[in-house]
Amino acid sequence: MTSRILAARSPHRVFTLGFALVGLATLAQASCLMLVNTSIGLLVVREFSLGPQVVGALIGIQATCALLSRFPVGSWTDRYGSRLFAFGGAALMVLSCVAFILSLSIRAAMPIGGGVPILLILASGLSGVALSTFSTAASTYIAYTVPISRRAEAVGYYGVLQGLAQGLGAGVSIVIVDGLGFGALYAIAGLATVVAALLSLGLREDSRRESATPMGVGFRLHRGVIAPSLAQYSVIVGTGAAFSFIPLLGISRGVTNPGLYFTAVAISSIVARLLTGRIADRRGRFAAIVPGMIVTAVGMYIVSSASTAEAFILAGVAVGIGFATAQPALQALAIDLAGPAERGAAMATFWAFTDFGVITGSFVSGQIAAVSGLGTVFVVSAVMPLVGVAGLLGWRQLSRPAALLLRTPDLTV
């Protein structure tokens, strides 16, 4: 029995077998990715004795490969379903883990670029393609199968699993490396993504109507979801800055453990996702988006002047609650705006703006920090969500998406 038939029989049910399978697969896949990503810096510096610029280059390769591969995957999931590409993304991550393991013994290096091992470059690129393929397919599955009346709530619950995976992976990776070594870490990560691949095979969908999105492998944006995607970008730019510069900012101000900011973000976002998705479904998407983005901006501004652990924790709570309130509603709005056969392309566009936000956030923030200092980075990061809110409200006022309301007359945007 397919997930859509189940949804038709229980039109308001979120926790179906398909939702459980894609959620557990995401938990395994995201845990693997966090194990890999949080170990790259240690691997490059400790194992290969290379500089931190190589770490940045490898992360850049991963993000670029993720960005470029999202668009064809989005189009293909609209035509062929999510199961094949969720499985394929997990399978590619297994190959990435194998490449990381082999790089420990096969150290053939590029003749340029400071002697970076070829297998490290390959592994990073594969992990980027795996990330975008799996996450686009999983998001598309959610977009097609959850009930419209509980769409933002379902996206929020799905995000809880991603948050748990991030906390789990980031929390144990260094422990595994110190106790068992890099080879064991990548073996464990590979086993986790094998589990994700097997769970993905259990996903079931009905055949989809023919997509209007042109077939191909090019760079194609879904124009209908540009507005919520840009709003997402305005928030993610600050997030990219946070991962890169909050540890440096905290240490420069005498805070011994600025990483408490990330702990506060993780805990508060999980709690918020469990509670705030219903607001967007019952009161409209903007009832969650606007306050969520404003609270995120407030949190970033607190970071700009934080000089104690308590201030970093307070900022983390604000950012966690704000982002976890706004992001599911933005994603749900993007799904709402997509045609019924183009939700894969819509999710690819939405998450591509997220990838681009991480890339540009880290790069531009570095330039700002060099010129004006670390505090200024987070003042700018606080302004960006406010600009995003203003732009989204302007778009809403000018466009008044009547087509959306015609497709889903019970929905309030």
Give the positions of each predicted feature.
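Cytoplasmic helix-loop-helix junction between adjacent transmembrane helices
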Residues: G125-L161
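Helix-loop boundary and gating motifs at the non-cytosolic
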Residues: L17-I59, A63, A231, V237-L249, ...
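Helix-to-loop junctions at the C-terminal end of transmembrane segments
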Residues: S69-G81, A272-G284
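Hydrophobic core of transmembrane alpha-helices in multi-pass small-molecule transporters
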Residues: L27, P111-T133, F312-T325
